[in-house]
């Protein structure tokens, strides 16, 4: 430990430099010799040098004296990482971190925090992260590990810090090895000894492999003393209740059983490095043999107050098999033994049992092979040897264990055994969807229905097509002179959405409408039909037309006099992307045909950590206050994930990590939180939405771990409500930077959307059919993903009229135009000459651009680039989130909310509907006026040459002729300069009346006087 002595205060600031990861090589040999230099006020301390190490571990404490603790929040720590160049006695910059003094906590409350190294200047080459712990203390640090450095001896200080004795290095290595050995030798004696020594927190070293690109995360062991541990530090992005907050959770790799990180990092731990470690006790009951039981046999696991029971097995065999896994949270274990009972049927008395001491249970760390079950002798009620044996395996593990997903959890002990499947975590896949294009061209020799009438009747023939529940109709065939009435001609394209596997058929029915009426009414009579299996339809990936075919029509009356047939062209279009989400929230834009997919450009990893402050959703007997049975659903591309349901908790912890392949960075991932209504309730109940979060991947930096608390905001008829906060850890990894940058130059949608575009109304109808297909498929899964969940995740109602959304979009447009308005105001300020110096500089710049017009575009582009570089340092470090202020959810009126939640068609009373109709009329009237004014200005431009006003057109033509002569004789530069100077002339040379040109334009006629 290094200490800087400045002053006589007792308060000390301790900065513990733990380690760094993935540093930039600077020595020319793909390595670096890093050290850390920390500066606080006028005190500067540094760690020892780690030669040839891009992932150094220091575990050194630097102590700074604080004169005024109250002034600490106005100061900052400067942490710089350098590479030591021994040959030239100089150093290279590797990165820096600036820590505000307001974020420094007290001793015992701080945790190790991971900081991303920042650049010192624009051209600095920096990468990597550094793990630092900082806190205030009043305890004097004494011992042989403390090195005191005087501020006055600058050169001596450097020599003392750099020249670390070899005995000290060997001693630190021995201490690190002892810590690693103590991690693997987990027993109670070590815990009791740590309690006697009064250790609050111990830092464990972590040695990652240099080839891995995962961020270094070092966590602190929880205090062995009773009581809750330190909470993660939270940094708010604003004072609003609906703001985004940055968190610092203890993320890590494989746990060693003591709550820390092991010194190695394996494949499984790297796949769970975005979640917090959760320790569990696993009990796997496989089977039994040689039991002397007459009735049905069950096995029971008892751990303190927790009790889990297996399914009943028939007594036909003396060797029953269960193959069930029970999981108990280690943080809630209140017993020293776990008991396994074998019972007969529903009897309370057991026939035998097996006991395990928790201190002797091993710890399994993936990717170790599963623990092999063993046979254990069953004890009778008297403690003697009973009849039979029980095959079980018991071990400690984490949520990374393979048995975790399908196991019975102790927190779900109150859930009925038949409902356990509805609370498990699952991964779903959306069905592979295709657009089915059917071109109804024509029909021949259709049997026309005359209904016994002697009068000549013109048939009204149309075609009805049905695929599953989707029904579309063509228009009534129009009369063509070259074709008879029995040969109708339509030539219409109809689109359907179908899902693999193709089990449905296309039913084509030719109908004749009798006695008038609407199409599809009771007067339509089928005159022929044909069924075509979808599996026989030809697939296409481009815009090349497939061949058309003739199909025979069955008229149903065995009348062979007419050989009716219909001409169709059917194709499964794989070149389109079947839209199931709103265009602005697309999570996948790939076409259906796999051969058209672009290569993968990255990997998206999301750690769903926990939720806090959830709103109670139900009241359950025996529970004080409301509770919630919450789970999360994340959707990106065709992959849906569902976390397990945490029962009876308003602050659930999931700590589940999922991965998606990224094919386009300009996509959005959606994470929703729901209350499981199927837990101890009616299975037909609908899950209640709690809130959701959208994250656009293009706003994320590659390789950076984003740990934030996202507000869950739901709009109710009574107003906007915050229903809780969702804690996520998100990382976007880039496999090939060139491919990712190349994606920005490609069209957003596949080629077919531009060569053969679909109409807006058709896309909306197809999107609704796609939603039905996805919801129907996911609702048949186990556990089912309800339709209400699918609709909420896919934003099925984003197109519904809302006064609130209209205001939000209007002010978004105003915000976009505000830049142009600001430029116009700036020019007006220059014209007003209220600031003569600025106006003079502006005029000189204008004349410079007139004299050298070839510099105009380069200067403009250079200025744009400079603005972008200047804004880089002030860029937002937080990903965008749902903003209640931008959505105008905080200032919306109650009646506008009630209108937004109204059904379609409306279900409100007459007076309410009339009031809303009058309000819409008032708004539409103002819009109508603005549109009319814009049309009038355009019509005045057209009137310049229309001779509607002969005198105005004559004057305009004379002006054009004179202007042509003037522009031909006078140089362009001189013309532009004179025009600009005339426009920028001081106010004393201007008059307040409108210009003659503007007055002339306003006198031109428009078509407004022709309106009724």
Swiss-Prot record:
It is a multi-pass membrane protein. Residues 141-203 are annotated as: Disordered. Residues 161-180, 188-202 have a biased composition (Low complexity). Ca(2+) 2 binds at residues 344, 346, 349. Its cofactor is Ca(2+). One of its GO terms (cellular component) is endoplasmic reticulum membrane. Residues 148-160 have a biased composition (Basic residues). Gene3D superfamilies: C2 domain. Residues 1-115, 262-376, 411-551, 585-710 form the C2 domain. GO terms for molecular function: metal ion binding. InterPro entries: C2_dom (IPR000008), C2_domain_sf (IPR035892), C2B_MCTP_PRT_plant (IPR047257), C2C_MCTP_PRT_plant (IPR047258), C2D_MCTP_PRT_plant (IPR047255), MCTP_C (IPR013583), QUIRKY-like (IPR047259). The chain crosses the membrane at residues 810-830, 841-861, 952-972. Ca(2+) 1 binds at residues 296, 344, 346. It is found in: Endoplasmic reticulum membrane. Highly expressed in roots meristems, shoot apical meristems (SAMs) and in incipient leaf primordia. Observed in flowers. It holds the Pfam family C2. Belongs to the MCTP family. This is Multiple C2 domain and transmembrane region protein 10. It comes from Arabidopsis thaliana. The gene is MCTP10.
